[in-house]
Structure formats: structure tokens, C-alpha cells
Amino acid sequence: MPWPAHCRHVTGEVGIYQTLKHKPLAEVRAAIRAGQYCSHTAGLGKGFLQANLAIMPEAYALDFMRYCQRNPKPCPLSGVSDTGNPMMTTMGGQIDIRTDVPAYNIYRDGRLAGSVTDIRDLWQDDFVAFALGCSFTFEHALQQAGIALWHIDNDKTVPMYRSGIDTVPAGPFRGKMVVSMRAIPEDRVAEAVEISRRFPLAHGAPVHWGDPAGLGITDLARPDWGDPVPVPEGHVPVFWACGVTPQVALEAASMPICITHKPGHMLISDIPEDAEIPILRPQDQHTSQTQQGETHDTHA
């Protein structure tokens, strides 16, 4: 599917984004599925686990699962699809991972080949999809505590940086940890640490705060992904492990094809943000669908 014209030149459609911030998850997902919204998901689907996405041929899946197990901080595994099945049933009975992410990155032989908003035409019978929890999940809790987040207030994508921290390799997967940054008032850093610690499926507590040089980051104004954000006087840069880390590992693996979310453009699941176990049983899926009043077509 070609990149929609209304998504080509802007970070986000401000009017649509501001509207969706106050809509229930069912309406947010419907807008994404219809191609009406193709920007970042920070601040959307409040109360539900957001997830990074990695899709690859089954031949690589076991090594990738090992990579996630060995690196739980940047790669908190929250869902794995059945081979060839695009319905991520344990994360929501109505989730179709081919259409329910605002934007996808396509990698061929380890190189970014382009971005699309729909991967139905690229889907393969041997694909396995992995969902990895995202720090967008705990942002709702930070906001509820009165901690403002500049990127959400200004419709920007959170900045992400390649750190100098090595991950533990598994098979062909290896690389540096990616971190996301949020500027937090100095007198509230300890509170932000404790709040985010309650969300282990969304990277949990930060890995570092203060001088970015401690992570090998030389210039906060030049993130590797996302948008630069200011660090006002009296604020401290706080860094969390980030689910873009697997994209670095996927580049190193040089698979013939793999697909990820575009950084900042997440899969929003039906799993409550504070769930201890990221699995929806069949009866839970029915309850979730009823509560959301959601309808779905199978894209046949």
C-alpha cells in the first residue's frame, strides 16, 4: 500500500491526533486500520499496553526469542503470533497485525527499504510476529501523576538514541541498546522512576538519568529516531530502554525480509497497562470486545 498523501509531509495530523487522544481504543484502532491515522501513538489508547513489533520468517524466530529472553529490559516480550497467522489473538481478539499499526518499516537484507501503512501485500505464510512492550504504556501513569511530557503535549515522537551499551547476542541478533528520553523535573525524577518501575512489560524503571555521556550519547539535539525535545532548566534527561533495540539487532541479522513498526508508531493491544501477564484468554478477549463495542472485518 503506498504511503498516504496526508502522511508524507508532517509528523502527525494535529487535528486527528488531538481528537483521537480522547477517543476509546476501538475508535483509535479503527482509524489506524482504515489508514486515516498514520502517525505516532504516544498518548493514544490510554490504559492499554502499547507494543513494538518485529515480524520475520519462522527460520529466525527461535533465535530472536532467545535474544528477547537475554535482553528483557529493551525487549520485554509480550506476544508471539502463530506461524503465518496475522491475528495476534493473545493480545486482542480483533488485532490484525497487517493493518493495525500506523506505519511499518520494511527491511531487506538488513537495510531499510521503505515504510508503508499496510502489510497485507507483504504477508508470508512463514511469518512470525513478536510484540514487545513499549514505554508509551506508562506515560499515562506519569501524566496522571502530574508529570508533563513535552512530546505528547506538542504532538511529537519521543526521541530515541543508540547508546553505547551492548546487548547480549543470540544467533545472528546483536547490537547496541536503544534508549528513549523524556525530560523530567529534577524534583520528580525519583517519582518517575518508581512509577515506571510498576510497568515491567513496558521497560520498567529507567536505565540512566542525568549526563547523556554516561550512555555514550554526545548530542541530545540529534536523536537517531524521533524528534528532538527541549530539556528546560530544572529538568533532567531520563533514559529508558527502548523497543527500537530489536530493529538494530534485525539490521545485524541481515534477513532477506523483516518488518517492524516505524519507531513511535505502535501496536495498541487490548491488554491493560498494569497487567502482570500479557495474555488474553478467549473469555478475556470476548469481554474486551464487548467493552469496546468493536467491530472488525477480516480483510479477506
Swiss-Prot record:
Known EC number: 4.2.1.-
Protein's UniProt keywords contain Signal: no
Keywords: Lyase
Pfam family, one: D-Glu_cyclase
Gene3D superfamilies, sorted: PSTPO5379-like, PSTPO5379-like domain
Molecular function (Gene Ontology), one example: lyase activity
InterPro entries in the cross-refs: D-Glu_cyclase (IPR009906), Putative_hydro-lyase (IPR038021), UPF0317 (IPR016938)
Classification via HAMAP family: Hydro_lyase (MF_01830)
Family indicated by similarity: Belongs to the D-glutamate cyclase family.
PANTHER family according to UniProt: D-GLUTAMATE CYCLASE, MITOCHONDRIAL
Protein name as annotated: Putative hydro-lyase Dshi_3152
